[in-house]
């Protein structure tokens, strides 16, 4: 369930939607693409409500997990699913779809019910990219893919973004691997948006400060901190600096840059953690 969510997506960016299982990532993408009905609030595309608005929905595509055991895909072959997509999606790029089929070495004569998890993920990727939708949402697109296939996906996504300037929202739990793709990240936790921030700026704002407890507390006094870890007489904590802010009294502490994953974990931490 989502709570009091206010979110604006700008055109021409790749967003990373990051959250734990059950945080609401799939629910959010379903709402944005009008696949789930909202209970309150508005979802607008260029000022137009997207719900039951076919003109607006032409510009949105949500690529979600394919369940090969679903009756929807019972007996369906890959090539038949792609034919349905071509008929349904107004901007379908058949040439791109065929190119990606060869790129991923997919057998289009196979029945979807016989495909592995990785292969069904490849199909969701092909549907998303070949849809050519202005706003394209991908829900855990690399699930089941090995490291080589994941790198291939990141490359073709970046190539398509560079050529088209489309807006992509990619939900993932493999944060570090995809971090370089994201111009902005959206952290979702327990149905709420923790932050929506430029990725590079967020990395520059955050530092991990560690040392003796009294030295760390002096260094971060008055600053925004998260994820405190206490080990005996020592502690470590993430500090997030506002624009123009600097840390003082850092002579006796250790400062380290933080990865996107560690920033996310720190922001989602609740009470102080004693190790």
Q: Which residues make up each language-model segment?
A:
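ABC-family P-loop ATPase nucleotide-binding domains
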Residues: 55-58, 64-123
């Amino acid at each position: 369930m989502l709570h009091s969510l206010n979110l604006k997506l700008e055109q021409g960016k790749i967003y990373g939607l990051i959250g734990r299982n059950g945080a609401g990532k799939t629910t959010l993408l379903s709402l944005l693409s009008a696949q789930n009905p909202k209970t309150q609030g508005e979802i607008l595309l260029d000022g137009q409500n997207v719900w039951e608005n076919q003109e607006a929905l032409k510009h949105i595509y949500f690529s979600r997990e394919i369940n090969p055991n679903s009756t929807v895909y019972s007996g369906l072959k890959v090539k038949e699913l792609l034919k349905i997509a071509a008929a349904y999606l107004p901007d379908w790029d058949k040439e791109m779809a065929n190119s990606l089929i060869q790129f991923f070495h997919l057998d289009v004569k196979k029945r979807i019910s016989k495909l592995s998890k990785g292969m069904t993920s490849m199909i969701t990727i092909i549907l998303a990219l070949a849809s050519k939708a202005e706003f394209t949402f991908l829900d855990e697109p690399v699930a089941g893919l090995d490291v080589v296939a994941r790198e291939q996906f990141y490359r073709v996504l970046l190539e398509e973004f560079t050529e088209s300037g489309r807006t992509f929202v990619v939900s993932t739990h493999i944060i570090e691997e995809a971090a370089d793709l994201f111009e902005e990240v959206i952290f979702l936790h327990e149905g709420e948006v923790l932050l929506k921030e430029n990725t590079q700026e967020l990395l520059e704002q955050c530092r991990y400060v560690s040392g003796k407890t009294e030295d760390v507390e002096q260094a971060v006094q008055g600053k925004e901190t998260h994820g405190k870890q206490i080990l005996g007489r020592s502690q470590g904590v993430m500090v997030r600096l506002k624009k123009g802010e600097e840390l003082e009294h850092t002579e006796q502490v250790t400062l380290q840059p933080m990865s996107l994953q560690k920033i996310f974990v720190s922001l989602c931490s609740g009470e102080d953690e004693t190790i």
